[in-house]
From Swiss-Prot:
This is dTTP/UTP pyrophosphatase. InterPro entries: ITPase-like_fam, Maf-like. Its main location: cytoplasm. It is found in: Cytoplasm. Belongs to the Maf family. YhdE subfamily. The lineage of its organism: Bacteria, Pseudomonadati, Chlorobiota, Chlorobiia, Chlorobiales. The active site is at residue 76.
Length: 196
Protein backbone atom coordinates (compact mmCIF):
# COMPACT_ATOMS: atom_id res chain seq x y z
CA UNK A 1 0.00 0.00 0.00
CA UNK A 2 1.54 3.31 -1.09
CA UNK A 3 0.66 5.95 1.46
CA UNK A 4 0.40 9.58 0.32
CA UNK A 5 1.22 10.79 3.84
CA UNK A 6 2.64 9.19 6.99
CA UNK A 7 0.13 7.62 9.39
CA UNK A 8 -0.18 9.13 12.84
CA UNK A 9 -2.04 7.03 15.38
CA UNK A 10 -3.34 9.47 17.98
CA UNK A 11 -3.76 7.06 20.87
CA UNK A 12 -2.21 6.28 24.23
CA UNK A 13 -3.50 2.70 24.05
CA UNK A 14 -0.76 0.07 23.78
CA UNK A 15 -3.38 -2.31 22.37
CA UNK A 16 -4.17 0.02 19.46
CA UNK A 17 -0.47 0.35 18.70
CA UNK A 18 -0.09 -3.43 18.69
CA UNK A 19 -3.13 -3.84 16.43
CA UNK A 20 -2.08 -1.20 13.91
CA UNK A 21 1.37 -2.81 13.79
CA UNK A 22 -0.32 -5.98 12.46
CA UNK A 23 -0.95 -4.12 9.18
CA UNK A 24 2.84 -3.84 8.67
CA UNK A 25 2.30 -0.20 7.68
CA UNK A 26 4.74 2.36 9.09
CA UNK A 27 3.20 4.74 11.59
CA UNK A 28 4.04 7.01 14.46
CA UNK A 29 2.04 7.73 17.57
CA UNK A 30 0.95 10.99 19.11
CA UNK A 31 -0.75 11.56 22.44
CA UNK A 32 -3.50 14.13 22.66
CA UNK A 33 -5.38 15.08 25.77
CA UNK A 34 -9.07 15.55 25.12
CA UNK A 35 -11.90 15.47 27.68
CA UNK A 36 -13.63 12.38 26.18
CA UNK A 37 -16.83 13.53 27.85
CA UNK A 38 -19.91 11.40 27.25
CA UNK A 39 -22.97 13.19 25.95
CA UNK A 40 -26.01 11.58 27.64
CA UNK A 41 -28.29 12.63 24.78
CA UNK A 42 -26.25 10.57 22.29
CA UNK A 43 -26.25 6.82 21.76
CA UNK A 44 -23.05 4.86 22.52
CA UNK A 45 -22.37 4.69 18.77
CA UNK A 46 -22.73 8.47 18.43
CA UNK A 47 -20.54 9.02 21.49
CA UNK A 48 -17.61 6.96 20.15
CA UNK A 49 -17.79 8.85 16.85
CA UNK A 50 -17.91 12.21 18.64
CA UNK A 51 -14.89 11.35 20.79
CA UNK A 52 -12.91 10.05 17.79
CA UNK A 53 -13.73 13.34 15.96
CA UNK A 54 -12.65 15.35 18.99
CA UNK A 55 -9.27 13.59 19.05
CA UNK A 56 -8.83 14.09 15.28
CA UNK A 57 -9.60 17.81 15.67
CA UNK A 58 -6.94 18.10 18.39
CA UNK A 59 -4.31 16.45 16.17
CA UNK A 60 -5.34 18.58 13.18
CA UNK A 61 -4.69 21.70 15.26
CA UNK A 62 -1.21 20.48 16.19
CA UNK A 63 -0.40 19.54 12.58
CA UNK A 64 -1.64 22.91 11.29
CA UNK A 65 0.87 24.69 13.56
CA UNK A 66 3.73 22.54 12.26
CA UNK A 67 2.47 22.51 8.66
CA UNK A 68 2.74 18.71 8.58
CA UNK A 69 0.49 16.54 6.45
CA UNK A 70 -0.52 13.09 7.63
CA UNK A 71 -3.18 10.43 7.69
CA UNK A 72 -4.46 10.78 11.24
CA UNK A 73 -6.13 7.78 12.87
CA UNK A 74 -8.10 8.22 16.08
CA UNK A 75 -10.46 5.83 17.84
CA UNK A 76 -12.62 5.39 20.90
CA UNK A 77 -14.11 2.18 22.28
CA UNK A 78 -17.08 1.75 24.62
CA UNK A 79 -18.81 -1.22 26.17
CA UNK A 80 -22.58 -0.92 26.39
CA UNK A 81 -25.81 -2.78 26.98
CA UNK A 82 -28.37 -0.86 25.00
CA UNK A 83 -27.84 2.78 25.98
CA UNK A 84 -26.10 1.95 29.27
CA UNK A 85 -22.38 2.65 28.86
CA UNK A 86 -19.66 0.92 30.87
CA UNK A 87 -16.56 3.11 30.88
CA UNK A 88 -13.19 2.57 32.47
CA UNK A 89 -13.60 1.68 36.15
CA UNK A 90 -12.19 3.86 38.90
CA UNK A 91 -10.99 0.82 40.85
CA UNK A 92 -11.79 -2.67 42.09
CA UNK A 93 -15.30 -1.99 43.41
CA UNK A 94 -16.57 -0.35 40.24
CA UNK A 95 -14.91 -3.01 38.06
CA UNK A 96 -16.47 -5.76 40.18
CA UNK A 97 -19.91 -4.15 39.82
CA UNK A 98 -19.53 -3.84 36.04
CA UNK A 99 -18.53 -7.48 35.58
CA UNK A 100 -21.35 -8.61 37.86
CA UNK A 101 -23.72 -6.76 35.55
CA UNK A 102 -22.15 -8.06 32.31
CA UNK A 103 -21.68 -11.71 33.31
CA UNK A 104 -24.14 -14.17 31.85
CA UNK A 105 -25.41 -11.64 29.29
CA UNK A 106 -24.67 -10.21 25.85
CA UNK A 107 -23.29 -6.70 25.52
CA UNK A 108 -22.01 -4.54 22.69
CA UNK A 109 -18.53 -3.19 22.11
CA UNK A 110 -18.57 -0.08 19.90
CA UNK A 111 -15.45 1.45 18.38
CA UNK A 112 -15.66 4.68 16.46
CA UNK A 113 -12.69 5.69 14.36
CA UNK A 114 -11.71 8.67 12.23
CA UNK A 115 -9.19 8.74 9.40
CA UNK A 116 -8.32 12.28 8.39
CA UNK A 117 -6.06 13.66 5.68
CA UNK A 118 -5.75 17.28 4.54
CA UNK A 119 -8.66 16.66 2.12
CA UNK A 120 -10.60 13.66 3.47
CA UNK A 121 -12.42 13.10 6.74
CA UNK A 122 -13.75 9.55 7.11
CA UNK A 123 -15.51 8.28 10.24
CA UNK A 124 -17.42 5.14 11.05
CA UNK A 125 -18.18 2.85 13.95
CA UNK A 126 -18.13 -0.92 14.29
CA UNK A 127 -20.15 -2.97 16.77
CA UNK A 128 -19.32 -6.44 18.09
CA UNK A 129 -21.65 -8.45 20.32
CA UNK A 130 -19.95 -10.33 23.15
CA UNK A 131 -21.58 -12.82 25.52
CA UNK A 132 -19.94 -13.65 28.83
CA UNK A 133 -20.54 -16.89 30.69
CA UNK A 134 -22.05 -16.67 34.14
CA UNK A 135 -19.22 -15.77 36.52
CA UNK A 136 -19.20 -16.31 40.27
CA UNK A 137 -18.16 -13.50 42.58
CA UNK A 138 -14.98 -15.46 43.26
CA UNK A 139 -14.21 -15.76 39.53
CA UNK A 140 -14.74 -12.02 39.03
CA UNK A 141 -12.55 -11.11 42.00
CA UNK A 142 -9.83 -13.54 40.87
CA UNK A 143 -9.80 -12.06 37.37
CA UNK A 144 -9.64 -8.49 38.69
CA UNK A 145 -6.82 -9.29 41.13
CA UNK A 146 -4.83 -11.11 38.44
CA UNK A 147 -5.30 -8.71 35.52
CA UNK A 148 -6.26 -5.36 37.09
CA UNK A 149 -8.09 -4.20 33.92
CA UNK A 150 -8.78 -0.72 35.24
CA UNK A 151 -7.66 0.96 32.02
CA UNK A 152 -10.22 -0.94 29.94
CA UNK A 153 -13.81 -0.04 29.12
CA UNK A 154 -16.18 -2.53 30.70
CA UNK A 155 -13.50 -3.71 33.14
CA UNK A 156 -12.13 -6.50 31.00
CA UNK A 157 -9.73 -7.21 28.18
CA UNK A 158 -10.93 -9.93 25.83
CA UNK A 159 -7.29 -10.81 25.16
CA UNK A 160 -6.41 -11.16 28.86
CA UNK A 161 -5.45 -14.50 30.39
CA UNK A 162 -8.43 -15.86 32.37
CA UNK A 163 -10.99 -13.79 30.43
CA UNK A 164 -10.77 -16.26 27.52
CA UNK A 165 -12.37 -18.81 29.86
CA UNK A 166 -15.41 -16.58 30.32
CA UNK A 167 -16.20 -15.57 26.72
CA UNK A 168 -19.18 -17.58 25.51
CA UNK A 169 -19.50 -16.03 22.05
CA UNK A 170 -18.36 -13.17 19.85
CA UNK A 171 -20.51 -11.93 16.98
CA UNK A 172 -18.44 -9.54 14.89
CA UNK A 173 -14.85 -8.35 14.76
CA UNK A 174 -12.60 -9.64 17.55
CA UNK A 175 -10.08 -6.84 16.98
CA UNK A 176 -12.84 -4.30 17.49
CA UNK A 177 -13.25 -5.60 21.04
CA UNK A 178 -9.50 -5.23 21.62
CA UNK A 179 -9.76 -1.61 20.47
CA UNK A 180 -9.45 -1.19 16.70
CA UNK A 181 -11.55 -2.83 13.95
CA UNK A 182 -8.60 -3.59 11.69
CA UNK A 183 -10.47 -4.81 8.61
CA UNK A 184 -12.64 -1.67 8.48
CA UNK A 185 -9.64 0.58 9.07
CA UNK A 186 -7.74 -1.23 6.29
CA UNK A 187 -10.63 -0.83 3.84
CA UNK A 188 -11.01 2.84 4.74
CA UNK A 189 -7.27 3.42 4.21
CA UNK A 190 -7.50 1.78 0.78
CA UNK A 191 -10.44 4.03 -0.13
CA UNK A 192 -8.53 7.12 1.01
CA UNK A 193 -5.47 6.17 -1.04
CA UNK A 194 -7.66 5.59 -4.10
CA UNK A 195 -9.00 9.15 -3.77
CA UNK A 196 -5.58 10.84 -3.58
Amino acid sequence: MNLPYPIILASQSPRRRELLALTLLPFETMSVNTPETLNPTLSPEENVLAIAHEKADAVATILAHTKRQAIVLTADTMVAQGRHIFGKPSGFDEAFSMLQHLQGKTHQVHTGFTLRTPTINHSEYVTTHVTLNAMSSEAIAHYLHQQQPYDKAGSYGIQDPLMACHISSINGCYYNVVGLPLSRVWLALQAIIAQQ
